[in-house]
Design a protein with these regions (language model features):
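A cross-family detector of function-defining hotspots
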Residues: 27, 40-80, 107-187, 191-201
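Short, compositionally biased strand/turn segments
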Residues: 81-93
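Bacterial N-terminal signal peptides
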Residues: 10-18
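Sec-dependent signal peptide cleavage junction
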Residues: 19-29
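Second-shell loop/turn segments in exported
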Residues: 94-101
Length: 202
C-alpha cells in the first residue's frame, strides 16, 4: 500500500510536466524543467534493486537504479538530482514525458502532426527548432519507423545535450528513453548542420 501511494505521488508529479492529450514541442528549457520535476518525484521512491551493486568497472561513477516504471542511470547510488541523472528508460505507461507522451500511445500521437518524408535513407529529418539548437529525426527500416528522436541543446555553459527517444513497435510507442549529456556549442552546431544537410537531400 505504501508503495502504491508513493507511485501515485510519483505519477502525479511526473504528469505535471505535460498533458498526454497533445504532444508538445521539445526544447532545452522544457527538457531541463522536466528533468528537475522527474528528479523531485523520483526522490519519493525507493529503487527495487541495490544500485550500489550495479557499478560497472568499465564506467566508473555510473549506477543503474531499477523502478517499477523502468530504469534510471545516475552518477550516484543514492537519490539523484536532475544534474546527476544521465539516462531514463521508461517501459510502462506510469510516466508522462516532457512532450506529454506515454508508453502505449500511437506513433501519430507522438509525432503530433509531423510527417515522415518519403526517403530511401535510414534517417529522415522531421523538423528543426525555430529558436535555439535542436531537431527531430526518425529511424527507418524495412518494417517502417522503429524510432523517433528529439535532440535539443542548452547552450548555457556547461552545454548540455538532451535526447528524447521513442522506441516504436508497429504503430505504438513501446519505450521512452531520456538522456542528458555534456556537450559543446561546436558539437551542437555540427549536429544541426548535419540534420539540415539530411533535410535538404530529402
Amino acid at each position: 500500500m505504501k508503495f502504491l501511494k508513493r507511485m501515485a505521488a510519483f505519477c502525479a508529479a511526473a504528469m505535471l510536466t505535460g498533458s498526454a492529450a497533445l504532444a508538445q514541442e521539445y526544447d532545452a528549457q522544457q527538457a531541463k524543467s522536466w528533468m528537475e520535476q522527474f528528479a523531485q518525484a523520483l526522490s519519493q521512491l525507493a529503487p527495487v534493486n541495490d544500485p550500489a551493486q550495479t557499478l560497472d568497472p568499465a564506467r566508473p561513477g555510473e549506477y543503474l537504479q531499477e523502478y517499477e516504471f523502468g530504469t534510471v542511470q545516475a552518477a550516484t547510488s543514492g537519490k539523484p538530482t536532475a544534474a546527476q541523472i544521465e539516462e531514463i528508460d521508461v517501459s510502462t505507461a506510469q510516466v508522462t514525458d516532457a512532450r506529454g507522451i506515454r508508453v502505449g500511445m500511437t506513433l501519430n500521437e507522438a509525432l503530433n502532426g509531423l510527417s515522415i518524408p518519403q526517403t530511401e535513407a535510414n534517417l529522415a529529418v522531421l523538423n528543426t527548432q525555430e529558436a535555439g539548437v535542436g531537431w527531430c529525426w526518425a529511424y527507418l527500416g524495412e518494417g517502417g519507423v522503429y524510432g523517433v528522436e528529439w535532440l535539443t541543446y542548452d547552450l548555457t555553459e556547461p552545454v548540455t545535450e538532451y535526447t528524447l527517444t521513442y522506441v516504436i513497435d508497429g504503430d505504438t510507442v513501446s519505450g521512452i528513453r531520456v538522456k542528458a549529456a555534456a556537450s559543446t556549442r561546436a558539437q551542437a552546431e555540427a549536429g544541426l548542420a548535419t540534420a539540415q544537410e539530411i533535410a535538404d537531400k530529402q
